[in-house]
Amino acid sequence: MTDIFEKCKRTHYSNEIGPELAGETVKVTGWVHEIRDLGGIVFVLIRDKNGITQLTAPSKKLSEEMMADVRAARKETIITLTGTVQESAKAPNGVEIIPSNIDVINVSQLPLPLDTTEKVEAEMDTRLDSRFMDLRKHDVSAIFKIKSQMLHTARNYFYDNDFTEITTPKLVASATEGGTELFPITYFEKEAFLGQSPQLYKQMMMATGLDNVFEIGQIFRAEEHDTLRHLNEALSIDAEMSFKSQTDAMNTLEELIKRILSDISTNCQKELSDLDHELDIPTEPFPIVTYEEVIDIVNSRDVEMNYGEDLNRAAEKVLGETMGSYYFITEWPTAIKPFYVMPNSDDAEKSTAFDLMYRDLELSSGAQRIHDYDLLYSQIEAKDLNPDSFEKYLQAFKYGMPPHSGWGMGADRLTMVITGAKNIRETVLFPRDRRRLTP
């Protein structure tokens, strides 16, 4: 018996078959996407990860047995087609394949959980329930190919700039920033939590002498938000740098974003075309507005915002309409930022914290961090937190902690921006929110 892997071994992907191969024999493997039986001729569209190939079966040119094999094709069945390439202006890529052999690799059951041709639209929940099939649609898989390129570029950028990749625990004994947005779990006979952020570990790494570190990993927040931009499990890109100011950190973040956009523009044109989305690639430095300037902008548009308040949804919308594209917000009030954020040396009520925004969407938060043990200890107390809960973290600040800065960025939100997705669930393979824990 012929080995199944030998049977389905292709010579080309669909996007590699063009008019230049006319007259040649090719072998393609994929899923039956669509079937049109016009009586004297049958068209079968075969889909693989790179596109669609058309099988054309004219009854006058093929045996009855071959026509029977073609007509037996069932949607989403995997087949391997061997045949001759023939030019056809109406077919995908300008060619069709006249079959000489068809091998059925695996037959699909019917009915299908959703329509991969998208002639029948499916609700988001239906799509997520059958995510494996949802990703067979090229506009859906395009999002994850772009996300893959984004993460690949991010890693390359960090490696090129002398960063060391780290992996930090996701099971932790206490909150990173305090608060109640924690998922408690039972850790043998102790209470533990899923990590909100690698922040404390990144800072501890600054005491090791590695200077620059980054991590790409999951974070968990027990937020009850049920919005198009929040999830309870998310992917975060984090960086921390010794002997670098918040301005240096902002420059690193901007450089990374621009390199990601450039690489995606170069390497993902087909995917962007599948999404019918045009990249927004800034050529100028990202604008910077202070927190106080944000208040003036928001209030001038009849949305109330007072000093010491975070941006609410109405304020974000107004700011996004005013600023457009990518921009930084700086000089946030110290009182509303985490305990580890360094106050401004000129005015302690203002901090060194910054946010990177894209229109009305927050992408990243960062700051210069406090490196002085006594100041850090007092800031923990000022936030009504117990320093004893941070004993191991604080220890790293007793023996020569360098001044340092860093940031964390939501990779899923950045994917939304790059792909034009309106719902963050579109950018995560198996999203987790308050209503969804499967698949």
UniProtKB/Swiss-Prot annotation:
It comes from Methanosphaera stadtmanae (strain ATCC 43021 / DSM 3091 / JCM 11832 / MCB-3). Transmembrane segments: none annotated. Belongs to the class-II aminoacyl-tRNA synthetase family. Type 2 subfamily. Its cofactor is Mg(2+). This is Aspartate--tRNA(Asp/Asn) ligase. Mg(2+) 3 binds at residue 362. Keywords: Aminoacyl-tRNA synthetase, ATP-binding, Cytoplasm, Ligase, Magnesium, Metal-binding, Nucleotide-binding, Protein biosynthesis. Binds 3 Mg(2+) cations per subunit. The strongest magnesium site (Mg1) is bound to the beta- and gamma-phosphates of ATP and four water molecules complete its coordination sphere. PROSITE patterns: AA_TRNA_LIGASE_II (PS50862). GO terms for cellular component: aminoacyl-tRNA synthetase multienzyme complex; cytosol. Homodimer. It holds the Pfam family tRNA-synt_2. NCBIfam families: aspS_nondisc (TIGR00458), PRK05159.1 (NF003483). L-aspartate binds at residues 177, 221, 365, 369. GO terms for biological process: aspartyl-tRNA aminoacylation. The record marks 92 as: Important for tRNA non-discrimination. GO terms for molecular function: aspartate-tRNA ligase activity; aspartate-tRNA(Asn) ligase activity; ATP binding; magnesium ion binding; RNA binding.
